[in-house]
């Protein structure tokens, strides 16, 4: 299935059923009173976070989603059946924006599994004429129509929720690293931009299988990424909610004059995209140490110590230096809070909180 992280849909709640205009008619009861039942409420539209889903692909195929209309009332004081609610399952981490008169409004952030929010309320069913009888109105010849359901145009934006985000220049070996520490099997090749979409991997502690860490690998960043260069800009949003970042630099991109220029370049792009993301806690990693001599490697380690940088030197391909790095990942993950908002619902009208509008009636001829 293709990875799709943005889609536009229209949701339409069900209409309320009309109230019934009816009078009791039985043998030997010439003046039976009103007995029209109420219409059923229309179905509402809900959004639910489902952690089994990883893409919005299905919402590119279908744009309109409608809940069921309420049934009209009937005679003998029979109320109409309520319309069935419609529940749309979305990936965890989906942001929901509604189009309003002043632009888009964030109405829901599905950042927790099984979180559910109401986005379009069904219309209320109309009252039957039996509802309007009184001591002064014995035979009301009118009933109330059902209300229309709410309708909204929504934009869905998926931001993957992960504990750690892998960032770096293209061809730094991020995909090889995630394949070594998790069960993820991304495409790996010796050329830039092998990773075209985010990959998710789950790292499981060998001692405690319930101890898990979700790692997101995004396409490599290049200079000018914040302006749309390369592939990274589109996917940077997928590391916005991570607890921390793992910044991987290939030893091939480590020079003599300024060995850490690659780190600085990517960090500058992060800051230009989002100032807070640029300050996110990072673990710096130099990968592919199998490509240099032991003397060159030792010189780089000495330079890192002299510059006061804590840099992990590894070879993801040959499984060199991974164990200390993995232990650091666990320690940082468990000591850092997740950057994720709570589920919220705002900006959309909840019909249940409104006063019932002035009665609209349907008259019949005498």
Curated annotation (Swiss-Prot):
Keyword tags: Cytoplasm, GTP-binding, Hydrolase, Magnesium, Metal-binding, Nucleotide-binding
Record-annotated OBG-type G domain positions: 162-334
Cofactors: Mg(2+)
Major location (coarse): cytoplasm
Binding site for GTP: 168-175, 193-197, 217-220, 287-290, 315-317
GO cellular component: cytoplasm
The enzyme's E.C. designation: 3.6.5.-
Subunit relationships: Monomer.
Full protein name: GTPase Obg
Organism of this sequence: Desulfovibrio desulfuricans (strain ATCC 27774 / DSM 6949 / MB)
Organism placement in taxonomy: Bacteria, Pseudomonadati, Thermodesulfobacteriota, Desulfovibrionia, Desulfovibrionales
Gene: obg
